[in-house]
């Protein structure tokens, strides 16, 4: 709830179960997000409103979000860790039917294993990797939607306490993750 009275507490609670998606060895976007939200909740609320505004191109939202966190972290001699992966987590949690969680290493390995070609151009946006990843995931999703047996298997593994993944984005990300890690 972006309009929550205690925004920093709501934000911490909303992402606390993201686990290793937002915290890992020497990678702390969750901690920095919470720290900044506690210090200046209205600034962070404004950054999330802008990040979630689908009328603004993703590259602009990403740059402005990072700049906002940079303005907080740099004077403290800290890193903000708000990279493409963290942004993709925030967007996927807000719009799970539209976004896929991006992890560069997994994407790179998976695309090489399946022969997904990436054409590099001189005019690439700051989010071109996420855009290419999304295109690849959409191709996978198109195939997933044709496989009724796979869809039923996925539905059977989700109980009432789970997000039901009606758009099959989590299933698609599972395919990419396991294909990148274990194929």
Residue ranges and their predicted role:
Residues 1-80, 96-183:
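An N-terminal alpha-helical hairpin/helix-loop-helix interaction module that forms a charged
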Residues 86-94, 108:
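Contiguous, well-ordered alpha-helical segments that form the cores/surfaces of helical PPI scaffolds
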């Amino acid at each position: 709830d972006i309009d929550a009275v205690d925004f920093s507490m709501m934000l911490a609670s909303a992402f606390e179960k993201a686990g290793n998606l937002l915290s890992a060895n020497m990678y702390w976007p969750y901690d920095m997000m919470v720290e900044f939200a506690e210090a200046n909740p209205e600034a962070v609320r404004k950054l999330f409103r802008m990040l979630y505004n689908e009328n603004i191109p993703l590259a602009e939202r990403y740059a402005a979000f990072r700049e906002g966190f940079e303005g907080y972290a740099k004077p403290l001699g800290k890193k903000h860790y708000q990279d493409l992966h963290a942004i993709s987590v925030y967007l996927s949690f807000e719009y799970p039917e539209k976004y896929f969680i991006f992890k560069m290493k997994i994407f790179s390995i998976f695309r090489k294993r399946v022969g997904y070609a990436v054409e590099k151009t001189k005019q690439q946006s700051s989010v071109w990797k996420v855009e290419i990843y999304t295109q690849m995931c959409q191709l996978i999703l198109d195939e997933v939607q044709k496989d009724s047996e796979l869809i039923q298997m996925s539905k059977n593994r989700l109980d009432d306490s789970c997000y039901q993944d009606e758009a099959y984005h989590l299933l698609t990300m599972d395919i990419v993750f396991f294909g990148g890690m274990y194929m």
